[in-house]
Amino acid sequence: MSKILLAGRRILKSKKFVVFGGATLIGAGLYYIDATNEDRFRRQMQNHFGITQTAHADILTELNKRPSSALPPRSELIKSLKEEEYDILVIGGGATGAGVALDSTTRGLKTALVEYDDYSSGTSSRSTKLIHGGVRYLQAAIFGLDLEQYRMVKEALFERANLLEIAPHLSYPLPIMLPVYKLWQVPYFWFGIKMYDFVSGKRVLKNSYFITKAQALERFPMLKKESLKGAIIYYDGQHNDARMNLGIVLTAIRHGAKAANHVKVEKLLKNENGKLCGARVKDMITGAEWNIRAKCVVNATGPFTDSIRMMADPDTTPICLPSAGVHIVLPGYYSPFNTGLLDPSTSDGRVIFFLPWEKMTVAGTTDASSELTFSPSPHNRDIEFILSEIRNYLGKDVSVRRGDVMSAWSGLRPLVRDPNKKDTKSLARNHIIEVSESGLVTIAGGKWTTYRHMAEETVDAAIKAHNLEPKNGCVTPGLLLDGAHNYDPLLYIHLVQDYGLEVDVAQHLANTYGDRAFVVARMCKMTGKRWPIVGHRLHEEFPYLEAEVYYAIREYACTAIDVIARRMRIAFLNTYAAHEVLEKVVQIMGKELNWSSAECRKQLEIARNFIDREMGQEARMQSVSEVALNLTKEEMQTAKDRFNQLDRDRKGHITVNDIRRHFRDHGEKIDERLLHELLNEVDLNKNGELELAEFFQLYSGLKNGQIAQNRLVRYLDELQPVSVNRSGGGI
């Protein structure tokens, strides 16, 4: 500690003190200028549409009573969308669109929502999983004398606290470690993080603190030891983003909103005065088309903002610039003791988070301009960049391999220009709300954490622009989301004791569905075993149950992807496991939704393509093709001998028939679907055949760690299945 104090004295005598001391005064000044934010917010709540504090409390108390009725089926919601007229029609079922629907319906406005794909199918399910105020925004606010950025942080910290309060089953405080490798940075970073606590005020999650080098290495043993001076631990929020998004939608529906996923807007409708009066939509499941009548249309489509704006006005100037951010998932041992890691300055000037999530580790993100697409896919170069940055922060004795990447995804950020500013080149730092001449209300930009505040301002703008008549003001601060009403951290114990579920399964159900977990538990079938009594797993290494597929249909899952990617998160956690549960998921859905055998095959094909393209399987194959051959003569001969064992006919390539025959000759019967998967995983040029060059490439990748493991090689070596949650997820 004495070294740190000496470093502090040097700072006082150096030029850094001008910055450091000036920053202190600026930070205090900024806080003083905006210290009345919370009081001002309370006054707004009291005066909004004449609502009093008592009336607001009464309304919120009534709304926070746990709804006892079941969710209406999708067919009933579609029927309402066809027959009724609405005050507000929201286009987009991501976090912001769902937030607008919830805010609108709880003000007493008749509300409809349509989503082209599934709820949270786009950007909202592909985040870093953090609920944060933005440490780097605060740094910019202090050193850049930027009051706007300071207020953004203040707003985000309020919303962070609110999210943790209204959905405690889906969100929680997460400790994040900031390693320090230069002595002068200890007081510098300590001050910045303490300012973060200070600005949080009463809503601070837990106070930050400094730990020594020894304590940091004890908590994060894989951390690079050289030059480490210590670390600062601070707290932000973390959540299950897709489930949170769904929770907002379900809450809106329970409060009266009519929402439907897989409904595409074909065109916007205008009256004789050129003002919007609804939309022509198409049900992508049934093919049915109809008009939805509405007094106001809200565009909350994220990266696709301009496509809806151009429906209203073909000559409008685009404002959205999609930017792609890639994340990867690694095994859980990369984030020990449930602690995250922050790299505050990567080689390209960004920050990278390294966070525990769902018993795995999420790392990201990158930032690059992108084409607008409904199916963004991660590129291998972005994955390699993240791995490279991780290696910089971990010890030399820790081998971070490409094959350790279990899954990877790309999400599009909706960066926007403010159309109200003359400088059209500059991007808006926060969200923007635009009301067009035809009456389209567009909300664009922003971030996950502030979705509720964005929704509130959007509904305010819609009410003003269209003279709508709400029954009360905004009541979403403190409004509990679906599953939160009777949730407590020990709920899972009741699931274990009352239903006979395994502990990890019970914890998963409680942390996914909150107090609705009991409904899922009652849907579980008897196992016929002494323990667990109920609950058939979809996959032996993950806590997901077959009963959850049935429940997912109640939550408006319409496709296999809806289930594996968003109702459950297995596609985001491990692509091999996702492939392995897919057939069972389709079998259950097919039975429940009366799918034909052709539809079941179609669902399987679409879901497999989704896993391969959007969850990183193709990028993994790309990494294999880029591996330089580095085999010795003996290793090449071993690989060639193994190849010839399979290619008995000396065709020069291996087919599914060769692999099937090899297993049969060894007395092993293997599933036909698995046979095709094994070949597809190593077939680099996707021609249905495995050539000798590809076989060499496979062995070379296994040798240098570019590939952590491969199922075909292991099957051939041992002729027995291997764990998918091993050190790496395959090629």
Task: Please provide the spans of the model-predicted regions.
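Extreme N-terminal leader/targeting segments of oxidoreductases
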Residues: 2-88, 106
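N-terminal Rossmann-like FAD-binding beta1-loop-alpha1 element of flavoenzymes
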Residues: 86-113
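Glycine-rich FAD pyrophosphate-binding loop
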Residues: 105-127
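Glycine-rich active-site loop/strand segments that organize a redox cofactor
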Residues: 120-154
